[in-house]
Amino acid sequence: MKSKCTLKDVAKACGVSAYTVSRAMNDKKDISKETKEKILKIAKEMGYVQNLNAKNLRTGSSQNIAIIYDDFENPYYNTLIKKMTSILNERGYSVTLFYDFDSISILNTKLMNRVLSTNVDAIISFIYVTPSAKKLNSIWKKPIIQVGSPSTENDISCFIFDNYSGGRIITKYLLEKGNKRIGFINATEKLIACVNRIEGYKSVLKESGIVIDEELIIHLTEAEEEITEATQYLLDKNCDGIICYNDITAMAVLKYLHENNIYNIEVCGFDNIKQSLPIPTPFPSIQGDMDTLALESVSFLLEMLENPSDVIINKVYEVKINI
């Protein structure tokens, strides 16, 4: 049986010391680019695999980042997580996914304990991080950011799309199309992002001189039977346009309308993941630049790891309508 290639084997083949090979493998700046490339090329040809466990024991780092989310069926999360994971992998980090099985859309102490027990280096949360969870994490001093939802306490760095502007843009679009009674199928009122979208929607109606009818705003989960009931309810209220808090909901609304041969209702969504859904017909959707959000949020998190500080930032990214 062929013996496993060691660091010393690579060093001998390269004509350098094991110390130099180790420095090259860890991308240290005191090793020239040419030497690094030569060592990495020969190591690859020899089938050398770096012992990350040994490296992590020396550095105290697991080279692992936790990503916490609460909706594995939504292509929006899958797409963004894939982009973040790709960036982290390129920078030498692996990813462990944590799912909110309680479906309460918050990172509480129960879930935080589960995350911290795995010895991750840092945390990316797609759900709201509670004050008690932040307090628990402060003991461990793990860098943490919140993505997709703003924080009311302003004590955690957040990277979000401009949900308020999104609500305004989509409502203006429907008004310009001639719609007057616009319903809004929204998620739970506990989600700040969804509240911000409603605020944007209301602000445009008010500016346009349209009386805000609270009965046209529905808060629910993504259960399809609830969406069906909400759609019929808005039809009974003579709505000629329906805004949905995400594209999955918009797809369910369109499905119900088409099954009932209704084609004169404008339906809009958020997130622009239409290409990932079996939709019966295209519909307008609010979108943001996921590539930029993924790159900047991950870069900030890794900077926190390398140069710890108490700096808190709230980055809000512009959105636009995709028709």
Regions found by a protein language model. Name each.
Residues 2, 6, 60-172, 232-237:
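Alpha-helical recognition/docking segments in bacterial nutrient-uptake
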Residues 20-23, 57-73, 173, 182-188:
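Short beta-strand segments enriched in small/hydrophobic residues
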Residues 38, 76-90, 166-169, 192-211, ...:
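Short, solvent-exposed amphipathic alpha-helices that sit
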Residues 157-184, 199, 203, 223-232, ...:
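Hydrophobic alpha-helical segments within soluble ligand-binding/sensing domains
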Residues 88-100, 202-225, 321:
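Short beta-strand elements in bilobed, periplasmic/extracellular small-molecule ligand-binding domains
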Residues 230-241, 245-323:
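Flexible loop/turn connectors
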Residues 168-210, 309-323:
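An alpha-beta-alpha
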Residues 1-61:
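N-terminal helix-turn-helix DNA-binding module of bacterial transcription factors
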